[in-house]
């Protein structure tokens, strides 16, 4: 009798197991990190992990770990940093929707600009919680300034805001004026970074046409490539599509002679170059494959560019990247994203790398244990010091260099 019961139980188990697995993978209760979204993973155009890591120049001294954290719990997610024509600053775009300016020890930080009249302290000012999910439902209301650039001719500050598009504010600050919120009749869903050409044109990235900033992780997990490089022309007030079908286009930096433009593709872990002039005009090329996921790119004034790179790649991620069906299953599991990332071997540490304009590595600084630097977003080299922003933490890091 016991044997019969055991056989019946096993048969029921075999019958129910596929049903149970289909329920888990189908995620009908939307318990997974991608629940409630039309998650459609595709294969990425990414260089092989082994090849990239074998040729990558590391930092055995972990010099980035010698950095100093400043303004702790005074600034919230300072993604991009900028200094004005008089050398004042840094200016920083914060997760609570403000652009702030450092006024010195006697005064501290002051609000320099807002990207919308909608901003209110009651709704938007979450302090140290601004970089947590508590702020996410307010981001589209309050704004999220990402890229910052001063026009060297006028002193105006141009802002790429994730929700309000491309904006500009005068040297005295105030409410920023929107310049580009739509292109080809469709809204700019995720303006990210920008740079200003000597002819006045502003080049900026629109990271995705499907997901906004709050859902930025879905862009990477899915591998979707609906991002664009855009150009705004002040005389005509028109916005044009320069490049499309990009996988999480992020940081933007014009070359020293303005003949080309560098930008990062975060999902594909690479630094790209688009030619504006010369025999290669209109062509795009990969100039560096990276060990992790790049954010902003900034010139140091010497014909070299800094790239901030986070969460270095792993062998498990290589499998997920090359086989979209594995992502479809893995990220539909009813497990919080932080644990899935940990299981995939994702380490939260930062690499910053200095390249020449041909894509050759000049220097690499790492914080291999992530003791000081995590989720760094931008590097500015100013007067023998590196100023390093972060999208997700409440401080600015500095480090003497070289």
Give the residues covered by each predicted segment.
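Beta-strand-rich domains and repeat architectures in extracellular enzymes and scaffolds
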Residues: 7-17, 23-56, 62-99, 370-377
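Short, conserved, GDST-rich strand-edge loop motifs in beta-rich repeat architectures
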Residues: 36-41, 204-224, 310-347, 398
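Beta-propeller domains
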Residues: 41-43, 48-59, 85-128, 165, ...
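Surface loop/turn motifs at the tips and blade-to-blade linkers of beta-strand repeat domains
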Residues: 69-75, 113-116, 136-141, 179-186, ...
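Residue-level detector of Asp-centered blade-edge/turn motifs that repeat once per structural unit
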Residues: 84-87, 150-154, 196-199, 256-258, ...
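Short loop/turn segments that connect beta-strands within beta-propeller blades
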Residues: 103-107, 170-174, 232-237, 275-280, ...
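Asp-box/WD-like beta-propeller blade repeats and closely related beta-sheet repeat scaffolds
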Residues: 126-146, 151-156, 160-220, 224-227
